[in-house]
Every structure is written in C-alpha cells, then in structure tokens.
C-alpha cells in the first residue's frame, strides 16, 4: 500500500493515472504525495472526476499539454496558483465545465500557450482573478474561451492579441462581463469574430468589432 507521507514518482502518464486510480479507490483525494516532475502529458487526466481533489503542490514544470485535464470536474477548486506552466503549449478545454472553479491564476506563465480553445467554458463561478497580466502573445485559438462564464469580469486591456486567429464566441453568455480594455486590442491576424459578445449586455462594443459587423452586414443582438 502507498504511504502518502512519502513521495511517489511516476515516470509517465500511464503510471500517473494508475496512481490516481489507486488513490481514489482508497478514498485518498489529496494527491500531493505524487511527484509529477517527470510528467509531460496531463491530457484527460481527471475527466469527469467527482471528487474534490487537491493537486496544489504538483510540479508541472515539464508539462507541455493540459488538454481536457479537468473536463467535467464540477467540484474541482484546488489552489493552482503556484503551478509553473511555462512549458505548456496546449490548454484546450482544460477546465471545461468546472462549475465550482475560481482560482487566482495571476502567477501562471502562459507565454508559450498557442491553444486556449474552450479553456474555461461553463466555469460558472470563475471570475477571472489574475488573468489581467497574462502573456497571451502566442495564443492563436481562443474560441469559446470564456463561453458561459456567467461571473467572469476581468480587465483584459493588457492582452497582446496580435497572434490570435480565432476568437469567435469567446465571451458568449458572459452576463457580468463589461469588456474593460478591449478597445486596446490590436487584432492583426484575426479571421473569426462572430458571436463574440452574444449575451454580454454590459459590453460596450469596441470599434474593431463594430467594423467586423459592418463588413459582414450583421447586427448585434
């Protein structure tokens, strides 16, 4: 039996998944006894997990993908503020439908991330604490990033959107979002904008979005 007072170091994702399953089978939800420093792939790791787990002290410094890592983890709200995300490139669907999640992510280095598709979709409790100064200068796909984040309201004026190609439905259904700072965005490569602010009644549409609507002969509802 694993002694949770000792660190256990899996060499790959398969071994890590076995350790997690073992812990859950023994009603162990504090997973900080696992040394994850050798893991590079954490995709789909906790999909539809029903437990309130603690992974706050995990070493993710070598991880390159967190694709669908916490999809459907409705109770998940572990403190991830000190995670080193410097090598992650893919955060696609990372917190999809984590309805309880509302962690301060101000310390995250996301400067190498290119894919943020649907990253926080349906995170109904997520307010966006700490995202103000994220370096998203390499992000290309931001579709549905905050889709139906009903409590999201963050000032994103400092975001470098120069590489963003797809941002359609990015803030769809963000009822409390006021759109602070969006006028400052320079969208040099963006191809897809549609339905970006649908359901965002508090947003004053930035000029670049109005220009898009005009080009497409559309109206904002």
Where are these regions (language model features)?
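Negatively charged
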Residues: 1-221
């Amino acid at each position: 039996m694993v002694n949770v007072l000792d660190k256990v170091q899996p060499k790959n994702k398969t071994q890590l998944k076995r350790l997690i399953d073992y812990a859950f089978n023994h009603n162990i939800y504090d997973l900080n006894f696992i040394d994850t420093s050798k893991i590079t792939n954490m995709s789909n790791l906790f999909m539809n997990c029903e437990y309130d787990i603690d992974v706050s002290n995990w070493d993710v410094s070598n991880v390159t993908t967190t694709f669908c890592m916490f999809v459907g983890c409705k109770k998940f709200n572990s403190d991830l503020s000190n995670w080193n995300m410097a090598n992650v490139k893919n955060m696609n669907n990372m917190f999809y439908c984590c309805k309880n999640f509302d962690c301060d992510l101000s310390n995250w280095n996301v400067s190498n991330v290119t894919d943020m598709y649907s990253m926080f979709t349906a995170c109904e409790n997520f307010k966006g604490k700490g995202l103000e100064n994220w370096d998203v200068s390499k992000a290309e796909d931001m579709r549905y990033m905050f889709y139906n984040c009903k409590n999201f309201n963050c000032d994103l004026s400092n975001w470098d959107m120069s590489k963003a190609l797809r941002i359609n439905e990015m803030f769809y259904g963000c009822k409390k979002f006021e759109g602070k700072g969006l006028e400052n965005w320079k969208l040099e490569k963006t191809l897809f904008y549609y339905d970006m602010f649908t359901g965002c009644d508090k947003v004053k549409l930035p000029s670049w979005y109005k220009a898009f609507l005009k080009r497409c002969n559309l109206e904002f509802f």
